[in-house]
Amino acid sequence: MRIIFTVLFFFQIFSIFSQDQGVVVNQESVGLEGVTILFVDQNLELYSKDDGSFIIPKSIPDNSLIEIKKSGYITQVIQFKSNENIEIKLESLHVQLDEVEIIESANQLGNTKLVSIEKKVLNDLSTSSLVENITQLSGVNWIGSGLGIQKIVVRGLSGMRVVTYLNGMRIENQQWANDHGIGFTELGLGEVELIKGSSALKYGGEAVGGLLYFKDAPFLESEKLSGFVSTKFDNSHFLSGNKFGLKWSKNNFYFNIYGQYTIATDYRLPDNTYLYNSRFRNQGIKFSASYRSEKTQHIFRYQHNAEQLGIPAHVCDPTLGDIDFSQILSNDLSLSEDYDMSVIRPLQNVSNHLFIYENNYFINNNKFSFYAGHFINNLKEYEKVTYPAFDMDLVSTQLRLNFRKKVNYFTINIGSQATSNSNKNHTVDYLIPDGTSNDIGLYSILDYEKKNLGFNVGARLDYKEVTCDSYNFQNNFSSVSSSSGLFYKYKDHVIRLTYSSAFRSPHLSELFSDGVHHGTNRYELGNSNLDIEKGRQLDIKYQWSSQHFGVILNPFLQNIKNYISINPLDSIIENNRVFEYTQFEKVTISGMEINLHYHPHFMHNLHLEQSYSIVETKNHDTNKYLALTPSNKIKTKVRIDFKQKNLKFLKNISLYHIYSFEQNNVSQFELPTDSYNVVNVDVSCMLLKKIDLLIGISNLFNEEYVPHLSRIKDVPGVPGGIPNPGRSFNINLKYTF
């Protein structure tokens, strides 16, 4: 009797335990260690143990999405069902076409199979900046000067046309100007999702050129305090950066906190001179907290970033003549002086505060989401004096409601979004007057997916009101955006077709600018007669892969009506050339992106990835090309992974090569640029079980080159422009606990 009781007791314990755990195995039914189990709707992750098992957190609602992923295996997305054993068998994946392939994955922006979404994992341990990391994707470039000021360019479009979201909040800063960065760093981020073109309905009412959605790393299901401390040194800028991160959870409470401090001097050119005033400093703190019950989840986030950015290649010359190269370069470097940001001019002081609250409610197959965000941006620009030439506050508040329902193979999203923006000047002189804009959008999206076939269709209506009391101006802008997609898979062939449209209202800077824009050395005039900019895009993606080779072909065509541009005039105001905003009736952007991945059978640890990006632009009004059209590029990455026991400390070696073709397809007011080659090398090691080391060399052959999108390529008196940094090395060290 005692034996029977004991057996029944252990059977009951095992039965209860089995309901709260799952297991991940390979094709041979062997448990897989270190598999990421991401509960998508709860923004919560955990990792499988050495036998492949994992414990399911308590109170996970039925029908919640779970993404199971591990490098070298095909990602799976399943729906959670309580009281059911979870056993996932992952298939080996020899060929992975970076983050551009059409695969099953859970995304904030939509279904990857039905919408043109690309994803990039963001690692705390990286030899490149946040922006440079993203530009490894085909068709993505950056515009800026050095590491301090960088901005994303997608298929030749940037600024107001490429909308940036951070944890659900649209970032409203000086995104209309190329002399300002994106306003935050890689601190605490987990990945970024990218939509190229105008098919972002849920978030992108004005995303004519694309949408970037940055997401924090998920919360961690673990009562043990975990985190990291990392440090980085890059001798191109003599950059010194330090970061930390902590994660902890208990009884359905979750906490993440991150901090960062980075300082950099003027960057070194290939001839060993230094570009004066390209130095910068960045400080950041980020905090997230969450509480979860069976049906509800609350998330609060706060983030603060403070930046001090020098503006290089800026000389106040009342004669408007050529600049002497010696005025913007220096021959030596003094760390004590160059780390001092208080003495340099011109200078930008940027302070950003971001507050976010999210609430999710789950019931049956439904998910209700409420989102509230508040963003405060303060910009001060100093010229040659102690008080700022500009001091402006930009405040943005955003509310969003979304209802998601799953019915068999259908997923329905219905929602609305309201945004209020206002800017206030605190100086007598200003570039943009005080003004407000308020807009509201309504959208509906229907997805259908069954086995190897799927489609989606959606529409969005936006209404925007812009007010500027200084000019006695009030105007309304409204339009409809739409998107539709079709997905089909046959054996190893996958094809997706997407057609979308979007619109963009004129920004305050385009309507009412009237002043010197110090970062660009020009006097800018707005145009209050500007109308809505409308874009339509056709995007086709074909994918084929075998065990050792994969290819993606992605042609696209985009037409933009009433394209807003800024052009020079034949006049001078306050010793600066005058530029005025204008509008072109029709602009066409077309091109092709090709991605290849080769994984030889005889050497399974070798990966060869290559992408080709081709973009052509045409202004039908002038029969010329658009300004700042990126040059065509070939990006090649060769990576060797090491798993041999005698090289246990060595993880991988990678070589990254960019070949940029010459760009002769220029607008009426810009100069062509030459072709160039840049080679970077990274070596990744694990010194101890919890210490990672990454050593890199950038611009290995010390190539002297000026990208066509460089912000400092058209400096008067400097033929060919100012080059990017020369050869440099960087060291990254990270301790994880």
Per-range role (PLM):
Residues 697-699:
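Gly/Thr-rich phosphate-binding loop signature of adenosyl cofactor/nucleotide-binding cores
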Residues 134:
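Active-site-adjacent helical/loop segments in soluble small-molecule enzymes
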Residues 94, 101-125, 139, 144-157, ...:
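Outer-membrane beta-barrel proteins, especially TonB-dependent receptors
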Residues 1-23, 737:
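Bacterial Sec-dependent N-terminal signal peptides
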Residues 40-41, 166-168:
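Short strand-turn-strand beta-turns centered on an Asx-Gly dipeptide
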Residues 17-98:
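Periplasm-facing N-terminal accessory domains of Gram-negative outer-membrane beta-barrel systems
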